Amino acid sequence: AALQKDEVLPITINLGTHMAVNIAATYRAPLGLNELSIAGGMAGEAVRLMTGETSDVPCIADAEIVLEGEILPIGWSKPEGRFGEFTRLMGGLHWNPHVRIKSISTRKDPMYYALHMPWEVILPGAANREAAVRRAFMLANLDLVDVNITPGGSCYFHAVVSIRKRPGEAKHAIMAALISSDIKHVVVVNEDIDVFNGDDVEWALAT
């Protein structure tokens, strides 16, 4: 909306937050659901917010570093990259918005938290993929036993699920997992298979 109106969009960039905030940030929440509410639920207390120095846009009060700025209304015009990605590959060149920084605030002796790809990103993100699969199975009334969003699939693209199977439900289980997030491949096994044991899963596929 700001771009269409040719207006700047005030933002805050919060670095060094509680891990619950980092995990919630990787979750694709539906419209109307605030990721900070999810973070507060995981942390057991509300995420403390405060107003920035240059605008009314809130920032996380306990962040190590807060950058306040504004997205300029010039579209995706700044080349950025290449960077290491969660897939353990180098990403391509991307065009991103231009952010003008207006203020930098820090805690006393702040710690700068920089990601080291991929594990710091994909392992916390696996919890969100698993939660999405579990919710899809619950809505589909499928008797789910366990879920493994596999590290080999970058904790994002592959799922192994075990179910207490009733006739015809294996196909429904596959469809439920596929529509839950960005999962590409799904393996469904019986409840006696350990989804975290690659040999068990391969044996189930072979037999």
Language-model regions: role of each:
Residues A1-N14:
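Internal mixed beta-strand/loop scaffold within catalytic domains of large alpha/beta enzymes
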